[in-house]
Amino acid sequence: DDCIKPYGFCSLPILKNGLCCSGACVGVCADL
């Protein structure tokens, strides 16, 4: 998926470089 671990939970969608973590995704958006 577009997320990397293990830095907590995305409580809200977080956009980074066009990718988005949903609230269910563990971690932060991948820096790709």
Curated annotation (Swiss-Prot):
Paired cysteines (S-S): C3-C21, C10-C25, C20-C29
Residues with the 4-hydroxyproline modification: P6
GO CC field: extracellular region
Keywords, alphabetical: Amidation, Disulfide bond, Hydroxylation, Ion channel impairing toxin, Knottin, Neurotoxin, Secreted, Toxin, Voltage-gated sodium channel impairing toxin
Entries under InterPro entries matching the protein: Conotoxin_d-typ_CS
Residues the record lists as Leucine amide modifications: L32
Cell location: Secreted
Tissue: Expressed by the venom duct.
Main location (coarse class): secreted
Source organism superkingdom: Eukaryota
GO molecular function: sodium channel inhibitor activity; toxin activity
UniProt family annotation: Belongs to the conotoxin O1 superfamily.
Function comment: Delta-conotoxins bind to site 6 of voltage-gated sodium channels and inhibit the inactivation process. This toxin inhibits sodium channel inactivation in neuronal membranes from amphibians and mammals (Nav1.2a/SCN1A, Nav1.3/SCN3A and Nav1.6/SCN8A) upon binding to receptor site 6.
Free-text comment about domains: The presence of a 'disulfide through disulfide knot' structurally defines this protein as a knottin.
Miscellaneous section: Negative results: does not affect rat skeletal muscle (Nav1.4/SCN4A) and human cardiac muscle (Nav1.5/SCN5A) sodium channels. Exists in two forms, due to cis-trans isomerization at 12-Leu-Pro-13.
UniProt protein name: Delta-conotoxin EVIA
Organism name: Conus ermineus (Agate cone)
